[in-house]
Amino acid sequence: MYHDFESHTITRRSFLKGAGAVGAAGLLAACGGSSSSTAASASSASSGAAASGKGLSELFTYETSGREIESWNILYSQQAIDFNVTTNIIDGLISFDNYGKPVPALAKSWEHNEDSTVWTFHLRDDVDWVDMNGEVQDHLTSKDFLVGFEWVLNAKKNQASNTSMPSTTVVGAADYYDKTYAMDDAAAAALTYDDMLAAGVGIDAPDDYTVVFTCLNPCPYFDTVASYVCCYPAPPALVEKLGVEGFRGVDYTQQWCCGPYLIEEFVSDNSKRFIPNPHYYAADECSRFERVSLSMITDLTVGYQLYQNRELDELELSESTLTTITSDTSNAYNDQLCEKRPTKYAYDFHFNFHCLNTDGTPNENWNKAVANRAFRRCFQEGLNLIPYYARFNKINPLKCENNYYTMKGVCYNSKGTDYVDLVAKELGIDGEKYDGKTMVHLRKSTADSIAALKKQAMDELTAIGATFPVKAPFFFVAGNTVQQDNATVLKQCFTDSFGDDFIQLDLGTYVSSLAKEVRIPKLHGFVINGWGADFGDPVNFVGQEILHDSNAYYAVNYSNIQLVAEDPADYQKELVDEFEQFTDLVNAANAIVDDTDARYEAFAKAEAYMINNSLAVPCYYDVRWCLTHVNEYTKINAMFGPCNLKYVNWETSEDAYTTAQYEEFAKAFDAAKS
């Protein structure tokens, strides 16, 4: 095991080997400790003055319970909780800088032909795969991208994960997926990249360090597709060694790495330790920490205790902690409160139209209610979420308001207009601006209009046998007091908005995995999930909700609308028809390949249709306050791809950054970006 870098005297690391994160918090409250004073990253010209001349050589950070990594296979996963880890051990063709601009990674350069149908990537020739001990196992060449691409497109290997992006952009990709889907498991598993090439899939490796993709249609955004994990490499020797089942379920002890870090230690639901990859190809081109120590904490309240004792170097603040600080003028952290940039995720209410009880029987009352358009529109037109937003941003809660399904900044038309502004126009809210007082969608609603919509829903549902109040199953991770408080506040929002005779949240808990304990058993009435772009086109958002596509992530995994559409009850037929119309609008927009402006206009109409029919309901943006020794404005900040939590080129300070410094960072960043 690679141990060039030693930790200092007493750290969380020694405690967490023998104790859980909760117990460790109590131990650490008595022992303090601090991070190394050696600078880990240089000052950035765009970020303003640093808090001190000393940076951190070792970073102490965290993740909250219920967000443990579930898959170490970066080709297979579609979850941020996995990418936040695996992006640090495996690189792709392209990465991004702190302004979200694409920068070289495994590809040193790339170009496309005149109509953007052929994209050529020129690979570095100095990249090696290493094992968990930092020992070189193989050299990376273009063949690794052929192996990786065949894996992704093979339905029996990658099980439809991350297939939608190449299927809609690369010649022959969808046909190859369909071919493997129709084969038996053993026959599909035996296929290799040679079979993929023979089938006419539009990827080629003319030499050891060149990869060429041929697109179905002009695709000016294909570099953003290529930045995503669907185009990542896979080491042929490792795939052969582990076999299909073994590689799909690969763990960190088996994984080969080509990224900036290795996993020194992993204790599930407890801790992770990253150390530098000794053979990292870009070691002299970026700054890295000598160690990153990540602990799983039960909630942000525990995190605050750790931060106070310098056992964490950055911490997002819960509403209660922010209140504690701001209500005491003598609190030492008052001048260190830093407002972060929005994350790249747009959070939405995702309904489950095929909800089950714990015994596997249908939750008929919820299923009837959520199939009703007026019922869903109450979420859209009558729900005041400001108290819920305050859970994330107590000082400026309405900065969290989200009115769109697609995240801002994903793509722009030829006039430089953000795509979501086109959606706003279709929704009739393009003239509405942030005022810090009222939610946009409540400005046109009145008490009478909300009451009328509620009555309509109750009358229509009573007529088909639904009973009130409708119980909406909503889950949070057990033992996480912040999530529990969030859920409690959300429940009160429904009460305050509609009374208790209409909708009531039925709060439940899961132990560690939302997917295994809630989503797969279909117990949820709705979830609030965020989606970040995999590439820079609206189809990557709205395409997740359509019918007749096994790659539509939310339609398959959360809303279960595809199951409903197979045999809808009478009360679900109108809902299915709405999804059919939405699907037609999305497919029509996606068929426009020769006029980007027209394409975006068509997608805006499709998205507006989805929102107006509340097939999913926009909820919030994640805009938090934090205490930190890390300059957020030096982190990767891309609207697409998995790279944002890669621990490279971070500017840090031994002293905590102040509110004033962060305001200067923001000004300098915006000035340099414009």
Regions found by a protein language model. Give the residues of each.
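N-terminal secretory signal peptides
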Residues: M1-I10, G18-A30
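Detector for C-terminal structural segments
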Residues: A21, L28, C378-A424, A478, ...
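N-terminal lobe/hinge region of extracytoplasmic solute-binding protein
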Residues: Y62-E114, W256-C257
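Gly/Pro-rich hinge or "lid" segments in bacterial periplasmic/extracellular proteins
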Residues: N98, A186-A190, L197-G200, D207-Y209, ...
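Aromatic- and charge-enriched surface segment that lines or borders ligand/interaction sites
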Residues: K108-A173, V212, G303-L306, N365-A371, ...
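Alpha-helical secondary-structure segments
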Residues: T141-V147, D208-T214, P260, F289-R291, ...
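Ligand-site clamp/hinge motif
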Residues: V244-Y252, H279-D328
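Ligand/substrate-recognition segments at binding pockets and active sites
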Residues: S268, N396-P397, G431-A533, E578, ...
